[in-house]
Structures are given as C-alpha cells and as structure tokens.
C-alpha cells in the first residue's frame, strides 16, 4: 500500500463578540507507511478571525485570520515546532451564491523547511434550505527547500440536519508540481451549533 497521513479530532469555534471568532483544533493524527500505522496526539491549532469590514448591502466581508500551530504532537506526528499562518479572507454573497477565498503567508521554521504563500478560492450555492454545494481550488507553495508546491481541486457540501447538526464533506484531486501521480484529499465533519 501507499503512504498516507491525516487526522481526526475536534474543532471548537466560539464568537465571544461580534466580528470575532476564536478557533481551537484538537486533533488525533495518524500516519501509515510500509512499517504500519501510527496514531497519537496531533499539533494543536489556535486562531482568531477578526472581521474588519462587513457591508450587508454589498454582501461583502473582509477578515484577518492569524493562527499558530503548537508543537504538541506525539510519536513524530506533527511539525515538531510552532508554525504560524497570516491570512486575509474575503467573501461576497449574492442571493443563494457565495464566492470566498484568500490566502496568506505560512511561517514554517526548521531545518530544510521554508516559509511559503498559500491561498484558495471557492464558489458555493444554496440548493435548498438544507443543502449547500460548492467547488474549490487551492494553491500552496513548497514548504521545504527541496519540496514542490501543490494545487488541489475539490467539490464540497454542507447538509443541515435536524438542529443543531450539520454534515460537512469535501474531496478531490491534488497535484504536486513536477509531475508524479495525482493524490486525493478528503474531509468530513459533523458540525454542532450551540
């Protein structure tokens, strides 16, 4: 089999005041290679999104969303150091359609590592009161000195179940610069709104 890695866990989002969202990610990470499967705690991520511009009439919002990933992983399942991300996001809503995206600078210290730019864009449409679908494209620079940048494409959905639950899913191909076989990314989550 091929090598793979990923994580599962809990992401907590809290809005203590209007225009501010605090996010903490508490992952359980895994990695699989020819020697078998390894599980353990992943790196904890913490960020704060501050919406500094919002216009209901135009349906336009701008936000900064800086974050840190703390070196809390066990069993070599994390970065091994604190990393940071300094992005800016924009969103435009028009009826049942939304276009959103942005990007920023990733701070990735460490031997053979490098800082890099990353960003993406998505378009979504509310198909019904319960179902939203969308398409996304993301681009990331190389995160190591000898590494390659990558591009991923995806289709996603949010299905609003009975209150307070939402089911989120997305997936699609990923392409590394320099060729080679395409990879695949997949995300699924159960949202709970309290």
Annotate each PLM feature.
Residues 1-194:
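Transmembrane beta-barrel domains of Gram-negative outer membranes and organellar outer membranes
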